[in-house]
Design a protein with these regions (language model features):
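Flexible, compositionally biased loop and terminal segments
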Residues: 1-197
Length: 197
């Protein structure tokens, strides 16, 4: 039987639950640089990074952390080579297919953050399937930000506000609901950048 994170690191049991962050944001950075160090192509680094992230997610599942967000692909990442972008999209699809049974078993929910209009149809379909199958789960939340950027989200919110009926009341609650995640995802309490920067 596999040991839980709390069994492996018993000192964690001494930390009161309220001291743990509610929302952890992971920015998996440095995968392409790692691949270059081992004289390989960037996609090898991204695949290795995805494997490490799966281990991290399993570790976090044992802790009283409610929301984990992985910022997998920023809006400016479209500037990367076509081969790298296409490879990343395949990795995201494979990762979602792989994580779905665990989300269902743990009664956890999946939420995509970012645009869906520019990603490949096969990935959009997988994202929508995983979101739909987990939408009633209320244990923990896993978010993956794909084609996400703060400025882009702000621009999309402004467009949505402009399209509201003229007599609509605009307040902070309305603006929160127009954010990706429909206002359910608070700002991160802890940000981990895997490259260590």
């Amino acid at each position: 039987m596999k040991k839980s994170t709390l069994d492996k690191f018993p000192l964690l049991k001494e930390i009161p639950e309220e001291k743990f962050p509610n929302h952890v944001l992971i920015i998996p950075d440095g995968n392409a640089r790692f691949a270059k160090l081992i004289h390989n192509v960037p996609l090898i680094g991204h695949r290795k990074g995805a494997q490490v992230l799966k281990t991290v997610l399993k570790t976090l599942q044992d802790l009283p952390i409610r929301i984990v967000t992985i910022w997998g692909f920023a809006t400016d990442n479209w500037k990367r080579s076509k081969q790298e972008v296409e490879g990343l999209m395949v990795i995201f699809k494979e990762a979602l297919d792989e994580v779905l049974p665990e989300l269902l078993q743990n009664k956890s929910r999946f939420i995509h953050l970012g645009r869906k209009d520019r990603i490949p149809k096969y990935l959009k379909k997988t994202i929508e399937k995983v979101e739909d199958l987990t939408k009633t789960n209320n244990n923990k939340i896993l978010c993956i930000a794909i084609d996400f950027g703060g400025e882009d989200q702000t621009f999309r919110i402004m467009q949505a506000v402009r399209n509201l009926p003229k007599d609509s009341e605009i307040n902070l609650d309305v603006l929160r609901k127009l954010r990706d995640g429909h206002g359910e995802i608070p700002p991160a309490d802890l940000i981990i950048r895997t490259s260590g920067e």
